[in-house]
Amino acid sequence: GAMAERTKLWVYFAFGAVFTLIYSITSHWIWHSGGWLFGRGMQDINVDIRNTPVGVEINRGYGDWLWGKDVRFENVSRAALIVSNENNVYTQVGMENASARNVPTFVRFRDSGKTLAGKGRDYLVKEFNYGLFIRQMGEPGQFSTNYKTAALPASAAPTRALRALPASNDWANVLEYGAKGDGSTDDTAALQKAIDSKRTVYLPLGFYVVNDTIRMKPDTVLIALHPGLTQLVIPNGSPQYQGIGSPKALLESARGGDGIVSGLGLATGEVNNRAVALLWRAGEQSLVDDVRIQGGHGTRLYDGSRADPYKKDAKFDTTAHWDRQYPSVWVTDGGGGTFSGIWSPSGYAQAGFYVTNTTTPGKVYELSAEHHIRAEIVLDKVQNWEFLAPQTEEEVRDGADAVSVEIRNSKNILFANYHGYRVTRSYKPMPAAILVTNSSDIRFRNVHVNGESGFASCDDAGCATYLRASKFAYENAIRDVTNKLDVREREFAVFDYSGAQRKAPAPLGKVAKLEGGFYSIAGGVVDAQGKLYFVDRHWKRIFSWTKDQGLVVVRDAPLDPVNLAIDNSGNLMVLSSYGPQASVYAFDPRKPGLDMTMIQPTPVAGRNGGRIAVPVNFWQNGEFKDQLNPDTYEFTTLAEMFARDVALPKANQYVSPDGSLALPAYRVLRQGAEDHLGWRWADSLQTHGFVTAPVGGRVVFTNGSENRTFSGVVGAGGGITDLKLVANRGGEGAAVAPNGDVYVANGQVFIYGKDGKQKGRIDVPERPLQLLFGGANKRTLFILTHHALYATQIN
């Protein structure tokens, strides 16, 4: 059932013996003759891998998020793990408590040829981690390896990650106790009677209306086979769930029991303020597996239609009831156990997964908590819990102000293969994915905080796909609320939060805050005299700034400006998101009035001379197409795809009024309405700004999908060729100083010399997004962040 709704699996695989393999799929993976060959996210729990040259192999040229616990390797001749793409933030690999028997090499690094040898014939890998390590908050990470082994203890029978369900001949069918499941009959009494009478109760497909709490016995097992088509449903306005009062559960476990709930959907409606979908106080051996909280996106109704959480009509506004119920899944009062495959996307609830007041161990496998108004996952006064491959998703409307995870008054917590995602349609900045307050001993392994996803569409220009990279991913991965510290890196393999750090290291460099209070600024450009122009897109304002004049509003017409460029005559070219393929207009910012010139795209062929404006940051589209070479069983790498695609010239371009500047007409995909209410996606719109060079000249730009900075030769139509690596960092943007040093915005501002080595860093109070050299002598580095404009002087 969950697989039908989400791209997730939890399956049983045989490697000589059958044990549980739990993994998340976000891209490609295959079984090759030498072992698992995969890309983009995998988690192994309690897995046997035997009699094979390679255990798990990460594709050539790809980073990955690989996490394993209690994995057993036996007779693996070449390497248990082959790690690719070293010294890249997207390579995050970790193993805990992995046993190795006759495995001479535990890790082989493909690119460097380095190896981590086994310790004798049989050994235990207590810890292995590779990737970016965060040593303390307020500092960038460094690439490192952690490898700790020990003697292998005597063999013991492995413990299943997920308990087995009782045999089907022990199941009692709830229909035999009078339940109807017809979406209208009150089945409360029949459900409770079945539970009181039998240990294992089976619910056939149906919608079972409930008007009071269904209470489990300590050993109750509730089994359904599809959480979308088998639901317990509280009807709107159910009397016992109304008004202000203490939480009242739809389904409630017994305290300290070892009950099981499997394959069931729980629907608390929209207008039931006191509702909790699942109130869990059961013990460490209990299990909640494949449970879907209904009420959010994708909710099935009894008549086969889908609920719309955005629906508004003359009689009812669903959005008025967001964040009006208690948490959907609430584990409290000593509750614990194993939670696997929970999908909790109901924005009517306070949070998707809420754990309070417990030291009972808990293990959470592949939780997806989404679409809540304030927080997706909350821990308060919690100890001894593990979250393995949790995902959160914050929507543009119901999640614009939401944090992914809140951890309060807690300790001894593990988050591994964590994914904090804000949808690409987001338009509002948010400071941090994870908030930590008054806590300690929180271990983070393999953290991925992002805001990009693929989109496919057809329009008058044909069909196309595009990887939309949002400008509004969380600015920081983690914020220590107590000590006012941040982890600015959004991709890393290891960070141990102790709670003991009280202040950040002294900042490097010196920056001055010139202006503040913006919604989100970017799209800047500097004219020949060094004056800065930039856009606050949300408020549709174009500003200028100079030392003498300060901040000036240049234009504030409602024309949806996004990015600016400037020609040799001082005319501003404005790329607007308005129009089916976006629009470009120009005006002279030195002249008063509202005169402007609309610029239509014209063919590139036949035009010589002038500068070409190209994006300062790109994101490579690695989705949708089959990248596997069946002869070599290798995938086209992101680097190969990027070099191929960025070299393609555009057929048309927008030429400035004086002919000195051309903006290639990048393909624009529309999502939503054709007017200003729809979204537009294009490299030229998703970038934080433009860089320019004449045909045959070099530009410096970043590839966010590799997190690297390159230089390349610009051709007619904006194709960029002859790529050369400039820096092994590359986030939101880059700029070249008068002396040739390259400044890269990637959490902080990193300075690289002509030899490609880092030679300095400038720490900025907020995440830098765009860098521009300006001022009278072009030695003022302007640093644009979402909410403020900073500057520093470069000697």
Give names to the regions the model predicted.
Residues 205-206, 219, 227, 334:
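Tight coil/turn sites that cap or link beta-strands
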Residues 43, 75-79, 101-104, 217-244, ...:
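Long amphipathic alpha-helical scaffold regions
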Residues 43-200, 227-262, 267-270, 281-342, ...:
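Extracellular "leader-to-stem" segments immediately downstream of a signal peptide or signal-anchor
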Residues 494-795:
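Sequence-structural signature of mature extracellular/luminal beta-sheet repeat domains
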Residues 9-15, 211-225, 375:
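Classical protein tyrosine phosphatase
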Residues 44-48, 70-72, 94-97, 200-203, ...:
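Well-ordered beta-strand segments characteristic of repetitive beta-sheet solenoids
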Residues 63, 324-327, 333-376, 381-384:
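Beta-propeller domains
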Residues 1-41:
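Hydrophobic alpha-helical transmembrane bundles of multi-pass membrane proteins
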